[in-house]
């Protein structure tokens, strides 16, 4: 299996640090507001990567943090007249609900930055002791010029970073690119006791502390959006390797592309967000997954209603295949499941090519539909179809009532009753079942292989 490593800039054979164990850390959200579909894109991609590694037999330990203290959270909370912790916890709850609705596997741990302050202070103190950091007026900064290989992830020198960034002049700093590990307290901000006085953690140190605590000094995979490569992930490497003395801090760096709305990145700062809640009110979770997985995780993706509508139609086709019931009267037909499985794994082994893997599932769906249309069935083919769909996190649940009850068994019962009525030549009653279901939004389609149903959009 080969994966693209941002650190080397090329495809590399995936070899975990420890046999069949994979330690995976993915940067979580800053819960300043409701999660948007840019978040959905990122976490769907890393969920599928995790699912596939598990399918391959690896034991994956997956950590995803919450940056629950930050300048923007403080500003928004102050504007609303509430505590930053209240705002953060409220949005964390919304986020976790959204992840469940998208069928994203929960992380093994969701550490919060505010709960890791003792570990953060330990690391900052260690960096000062080793000469990599310095304290001034209650704040602590990292000396980037002392960091061996600083810029190796973003593939830039300090001079290029200086030229390409707006660096605020700060008389506290020894060098303009030095970054804060600990920030001195300001009036109205949450703060913690530290050897340097009251203050709070800097952004970058939080992820180093959480990955070190839950995964150790070295991890296999670190993921996040491409907008985090610099400065966040670059600074994570600097802090972690300087503190532990162990290199590399991360063996494989994986970064997903960003979601665009037209030509612009979708982001809070641009105010062009579509929340996950809004998207799920119009489209199914399967449609959102198909939309995301139809492109490489490394590529940018452009949001459009047309693309989501096409994904919903594709999801509906797959749901009908998944909902098919075994008919004992149909002839068992052979499907080359080995070839389909090999195709799927070949694509996924090539840097998680979900687009081609998804196409394989659609091809299998078409073959199963053709077989049923000829009054046949493939038990093995149907089983593989559901297995591969599950690796991509497609639930393919056909329909639910507003109360959350699965209505599929009731619809199947009505279809069976309609079939019996037609055999008994009670066509008026049979037609009444069809029209009643149609009114309820359920469309019946009759064929030589039997009757299938789908939810009308």
From Swiss-Prot:
Its cofactor is Zn(2+). It comes from the Bacteria. GO terms for molecular function: ATP binding; cysteine-tRNA ligase activity; zinc ion binding. CDD domains: CysRS_core (cd00672). Binds 1 zinc ion per subunit. GO terms for biological process: cysteinyl-tRNA aminoacylation. ATP binds at residue 268. It is found in: Cytoplasm. This is Cysteine--tRNA ligase. It comes from Dehalococcoides mccartyi (strain ATCC BAA-2100 / JCM 16839 / KCTC 5957 / BAV1). The lineage of its organism: Bacteria, Bacillati, Chloroflexota, Dehalococcoidia, Dehalococcoidales.
